[in-house]
Amino acid sequence: MLVDAYRALLARHPSAQLLVAPRHIERADAVEAMVRGRGLTVRRRSRIPQLDTAGEPRPHVVILDSRGELASVYREATVAFVGGTLVPIGGHNLLEPAFWAKPVLFGPYTDHCVEIANLLVQADGGRRVSTAEELTTQLVRLFDHPEECVRMGQAAQSMVQQNQGALQATIDAIDRQLVSVDANRSASCSPGSFPLMAGR
């Protein structure tokens, strides 16, 4: 779906570049093969010293195959499409691109971030898409109308700023619950059997 939408965008905006960040870096080979199979040029970020390497043809697609670069990519992006929202796995982090004042596009499955998704939609800092056609329409619209793209990104960032206090309150409440659970843990619960897991 994303590649189809990108190819349609290229027809109107030939300089547009797609940066893909697979959730599992070990999938980079499969993603690269799929992109090449669609007739697009592709490079891995780990093999490009700088994204704007002089003297080399600019690839259509760059696969982010190293950790810790997503924030810098969001900072330079025009629009962000957040994956993991096209299939029922709960969705990925919608706040990162919003923090960097980028319009946030995402699919219908946002179980892990329902409130954030709703707040983004209400602020018109984010939009839900369900099909390749809908994604294409939104991408083309935002590229065709940069002023709308900027306004939408600012709305996304404003939503994050307005809700920072609520986010901290939620984190504090979770911390209190964890302390309470730890203090009341059953004696039959051995060390390490109740792990706190955090992930993106």
Where in the sequence are the language-model features?
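Nucleotide-activated sugar donor-binding and catalytic core shared by glycosyltransferases
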Residues: 1-200
